[in-house]
Amino acid sequence: KNFRNEGMDRTHNPEFTAMEIYVSYKDYNWMMDFCEQLLEFCAIEVNGTSKATFGQHQIDFKAPYPRVTMAEAIQHFTGFDITGKTEDEIRKAALDMKIPVDDTMGKGKLIDEIFGEKCEGNYIQPTFITDYPKEMSPLCKEHRENPELTERFELMVCGKEIANAYSELNDPIDQRERFEAQLKLADRGDDEATAFIDYDFLRALEYGMPPTSGMGIGMDRLVMFLTNNPSIQEVLFFPQMRPEKKKVEMTEDEKAVYTILKANSPIALEELKAQSGLSNKKWDKAIKGLTASKVAKVEKTDESLMVSVL
């Protein structure tokens, strides 16, 4: 189980289920092969076929899946090539695309905003987005062919990410430098940047970590797509529910006042009091009880105090 103190919508829940897998002496290429085979197997087990209907889409989980780099995806949908661009150039491009960005965002966050706004929703069939810029992936190993990139992929289905994987960064010196870069972003006001250095993690890497690939799959979203459920609340054991309205218990005096109010709402406070025939003490107690129980409210107008039913 995972928890993130973030918002809720049809595909997000603060508490969610994830499957994580780590395999020594493998890389993200191996993990992509494993991921697509796993999801094809899951689709067949659930539906008897690799195809699953989700809303108006028919999703085919049969392997292999297309593999598109982050730079290729952005260039395809926006015409802008992020390769070799500076932070200022990317920020200007984002603003030209009418994407709301600000000066607190570093290069990685800017690229993430462009991809999220212009590209992500277009990938309906399972597609691996690969080779993320280093600034977007502080825990991911540097790409073997391009030091500006990392060996990372995310699997997109129906315009949503359902898997995220790396060739894990196991170099403690490189990892420390990434943490320090995150601190600088946090100082600029980036609320998603890591605001501390995890010295315990660095010490563990110094003792030695073999080449490793790791992946996390959002199981709730995967179940949504395999079972044609449009809301994540439909696939959770304990979904978020509206609080049940408690039945209001009224005294006999409150019932008498409420009966008059319900038939005449809104009504002047003095008129309601007169019709109730209650003594001052009983009247005060009854009207206070009704307003405290949120079944009635008193509002001041230019002419008098008015009472109405809620």
Model features per residue range: what roles?
Residues P266-S276:
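Short acidic, hydrophobic short linear motifs in intrinsically disordered regions
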Residues K247-E254, A268, V298-L310:
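Short, cationic-aromatic polyanion-contact patches
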